[in-house]
C-alpha cells in the first residue's frame, strides 16, 4: 500500500546528461514507508499493467498529489559547511574579507557558547532541509556540539 502517489512530476535521476536518462518527464512516483518504491514513466503508466498498478496504489494511498510543474530530485550533499556561522548571516557584511574576519567575526566567535553553536546548527540544518540538502560535512569549531 502506497503512502503517497505523485502523478505528472518530472524527476532528476542522477544519471549523466550524455545518457539521455538524466531527466524523466511526467512520471508517477509511488512512495511507501518513506522511500520511492516505484517510478512509472508516462509510457508505462498508459499500459494496462501500469494503469492497474496506479489505480491500486491510488486507491490505498494516504495522499495523491499532482506534481505538474514540479521536479523531484535526489537529496543534495553539502561537503563543506560552517553550519553554526548562520547565526552571523548579514553581520557586518559590508566589510572586506579580512576586516570582516578580524574585526567582526572572530571577536563574535570568541563569545560563542556550546548552546549557541547547537542552536545555530539546528537553524542551519532546518535551512538545508528546506533547500533539499540531506547530508553535510561541517568544518567548524565545536565539533561535538555540532554533532549533538
Language model features: what each stretch is:
Residues 46-73:
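Active-site metal-binding motif and surrounding structural segment of the metallo-beta-lactamase
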Residues 41-45, 77, 89:
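Residue-level structural signal for beta-strand termini and adjacent loop
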Residues 109-148:
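Active-site loop-helix segments enriched in His/Asp/Glu that coordinate
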Residues 5, 63, 75-77:
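Residue-level marker for buried hydrophobic side chains located in beta-strands
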Residues 74-86:
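Histidine-centered catalytic micro-motifs
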Residues 87-119:
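Active-site gating loops and adjacent loop-to-helix segments of metal-dependent hydrolytic enzymes
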Residues 9, 29, 34, 69, ...:
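Divalent metal-coordination and catalytic microenvironments
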Residues 1-56:
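N-terminal metal-binding scaffold of metallo-dependent hydrolase/deaminase domains
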Amino acid at each position: 500500500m502506497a503512502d503517497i502517489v505523485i502523478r505528472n512530476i518530472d524527476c532528476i535521476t542522477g544519471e549523466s546528461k550524455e545518457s539521455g536518462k538524466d531527466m524523466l518527464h511526467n512520471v508517477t512516483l509511488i512512495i511507501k514507508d518513506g522511500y520511492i518504491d516505484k517510478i512509472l514513466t508516462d509510457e508505462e503508466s498508459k499500459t494496462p499493467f501500469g494503469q492497474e498498478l496506479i489505480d491500486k496504489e491510488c486507491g490505498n494511498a494516504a495522499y495523491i498529489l499532482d506534481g505538474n510543474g514540479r521536479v523531484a530530485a535526489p537529496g543534495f550533499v553539502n561537503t563543506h559547511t560552517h553550519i553554526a556561522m548562520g547565526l552571523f548571516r548579514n553581520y557586518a557584511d559590508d566589510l572586506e574579507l579580512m576586516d570582516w574576519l578580524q574585526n567582526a567575526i572572530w571577536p563574535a566567535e570568541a563569545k560563542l557558547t556550546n548552546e549557541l553553536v547547537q542552536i545555530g546548527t539546528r537553524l542551519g540544518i532546518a535551512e538545508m532541509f528546506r533547500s533539499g540538502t540531506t547530508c553535510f560535512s561541517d568544518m567548524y569549531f565545536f565539533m561535538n556540539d555540532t554533532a549533538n
